Regions:
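Bacterial N-terminal signal peptides
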Residues: 5-17
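Catalytic beta-strand/loop cores that center a nucleophilic Ser/Cys/Thr
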Residues: 149-228
Length: 287
């Protein structure tokens, strides 16, 4: 009897450990920016390092690819994180196939994250009224200049103040309002109803911009989808060196792991400040 009980306890522990290990897939698309700006490959490597070396959330794994992921990589992912010049699924060869792959991933509850310019969609990517699957999967997007249904804007601000949203949400744990020199996109697109976010979308952070005509702009958001999947979009960082900012790094890591259905610590996801040079950027400083 006691032997059977012991085996049962071990099985429960083993099962719990299995369910605790989640996998994050980073997909890096094309990039045309100069050294120190965007640096999507280095940024993905840095985030992978953080996820695999978290002191209080152990066992999680991550992978970085710079081409469209194969079926095995897609199937393994609990969430997929995109970096690059606009939404990589539309930039890699055979966008229709890529979007179909993502549709299947989303249907099974996979998460999706886009960082900075990967939140962007071009005029040719969307319908004349702005329809695109990313709007439902992630809750909003950056409408690239040239779009006809809506136009977002990109501008570097020397002192952009990033203010946490008012909602109580796990992604808001462990970081506070901060000021940063970056390019937090404004007038992002959330849908055809006066650009108001859908009911299942939470605005996570805002920034009052531009200085000469301030308006509170949503710069990060998340969605809890009906398919049980989750999405997270944040329109920073433009500068690679900003990954050294503790509050920004916690904010982004919170968002990524939340979309992978990982329970976040009350103090947020804390990754010690990494050595930015070690992840192979063309430059740490923009030039």
């Amino acid at each position: 009897m006691f032997a059977r009980l012991g085996v049962a306890i071990l099985l429960v522990i083993f099962s719990a450990n299995l369910s605790w290990a989640n996998h994050v897939l980073f997909v890096v698309g094309p990039d045309s920016h100069g050294p120190g700006s965007h640096e999507p490959i280095a940024g993905a490597r840095l985030l992978k390092h953080c996820i695999e070396n978290l002191p209080k959330l152990t066992g999680h794994t991550a992978e970085v690819v710079s081409k469209w992921p194969n079926e095995s990589q897609q199937a393994k992912a609990d969430t997929v994180v995109f970096l690059g010049d606009t939404f990589p699924a539309n930039r890699f060869e055979d966008a229709a196939r890529n979007l179909a792959d993502l549709h299947r991933m989303m249907q099974r509850g996979c998460g999706i994250v886009c960082l900075h310019y990967a939140t962007g969609l071009k005029k040719e990517d969307v319908s004349p009224t702005g329809e695109h699957p990313l709007l439902g999967w992630m809750g909003g997007y950056f409408a690239n200049p040239g779009s006809t249904h809506h136009v977002s804007y990109a501008r570097v601000f020397d002192k952009a103040k990033i203010t946490p949203g008012k909602a109580k949400h796990p992604i808001l744990r462990g970081w506070k309002e901060f000021v940063i020199r970056d390019e937090p996109y404004g007038n992002n697109y959330f849908g055809p109803h006066d650009n108001k976010p859908a009911p299942n979308v939470t605005i996570l952070a805002t920034s009052l911009q531009p200085p000469e005509s301030p308006k509170r702009e949503a710069v990060a958001w998340c969605v809890q989808r009906a398919d049980k999947g989750r999405g997270f979009g944040i329109v920073m960082p433009h500068y690679y060196k900003n990954w050294s900012h503790d509050d920004l790094r916690t904010f982004v890591l919170n968002g990524i792991l939340w979309t992978a259905n990982i329970t976040l610590p009350q103090a947020g996801v804390k990754c010690p400040a990494p050595d930015l040079k070690s992840f192979g950027p063309k430059s740490v400083e923009a030039r």
